[in-house]
Curated annotation (Swiss-Prot):
It is a multi-pass membrane protein. PANTHER family: 4-HYDROXYBENZOATE SOLANESYLTRANSFERASE, PROTOHEME IX FARNESYLTRANSFERASE, MITOCHONDRIAL. NCBIfam families: cyoE_ctaB, PRK04375.1-2. The chain crosses the membrane at residues 31-51, 52-72, 102-119, 123-145, 151-171, 179-199, 225-245, 248-268, 281-301. This is Protoheme IX farnesyltransferase. One of its GO terms (cellular component) is plasma membrane. The gene is ctaB. It is found in: Cell inner membrane. It comes from the Bacteria.
Amino acid sequence: MSSLVTQINFNKINNSQSTVKDYILLMKPRVMSLVIFTGFVGMWLAPDSIHPLIAGIAVICIALGAGSAGAMNMWYDRDIDILMKRTQNRPIVRGVIEPDEALSFGLITGFFAVFFMALCVNILASFLLLFTIFYYICIYTIWLKRRSIQNIVIGGVSGALPPVIGHAAVSNTISLESIILFLIIFIWTPPHSWAIALFCNDDYKHCKIPMMPVVKGTLYTKKQILIYSIILFIVSLMPFFIGMNNDIYLIIVCIIGLVFLYYAFSLFYDTPDNKQAKRFFTYSIFYLCFIFILLSSTSTIHSLRDIIFG
C-alpha cells in the first residue's frame, strides 16, 4: 500500500491548484450538512430560549467542528482513500491539498470552533464539541476503523452527538430529550453504514478495513442491519412516549418506520449482487432527515396550538 502511495506521490501535489472548493470538500460537506441539520434540530427542541446571534454562532461552531474532524480524517486516511473508488476524488488524493496543510487546516478550524463555542455560547457545548472531534479522530479514525468489526457501532458516538451539542448550546444541560435524539442517530448509524459496506465490499476488502461484510460475510451483515432496524423503529417512538411530540408524530413515524423495515427485510432477502443495499442506503438518509424534520415541525405545531387555544 505504501509503495503505491509513494509511486503516484498523491498526483504530484501542486499548491497553486488549491481552491476554496477543495477546502470545502476537505471538510466532507455532505456529512457536515447532516451534522448542522441535526445540531440545529437539537437547538430548536430545547425548552429554553437563545438570542438568534448566539444561535447562529453555535451552528457555525458545530459546522466548523464537523469540518475540522472531516479534514483530519482525510489526512489520516489518505493512504486508503487512494485505493477506494468512492474516495479517489478527495482533495489530498487528487493532489490539490498537501497532507500537512490538511492537518493544519483541521486543527486550526477545530480550535476556533471549540474556542468560540466556549466564548460565545457556553462551556458545556464547547466541551461536547471538543469531545466529538476527539472521539471521531482518535477513537474512531485512528483506533477503531482499521482494527475492529465494531468500528461503526462504537465510532457512531461522535456522529450522534451534534443534537446533544445543539440542545446544550441553548439549555446548558444534557436532558432526556437530547439523549433520545442521540439514540436515534446512534442506532441509525450501523445499518446505514453497513449498507454502504455491502455495495463497497471489494474496496473495504482491498484496503483490509474490517467492516462487517468483510469479516462476517454478507448474510450476517444483513441480519445485523435487520436487528438494528427493528431497534431503531422502537427507539423512534420514544419522543412520543416521553411527551416530546404528539399523536401526529407517532402516526407518521410509524409509517416511515414500517417502510424502513420493509427495505431492511427486502435487503435481507436480496440477491447476492446486493442491489437492494443502495436502495436501503438512500432511504435511510431520507428516513433520518424526515424524523428530525418531523420532530421539529410537530413540536412547533403543538406549541402554537397550546398558545392559541390555551
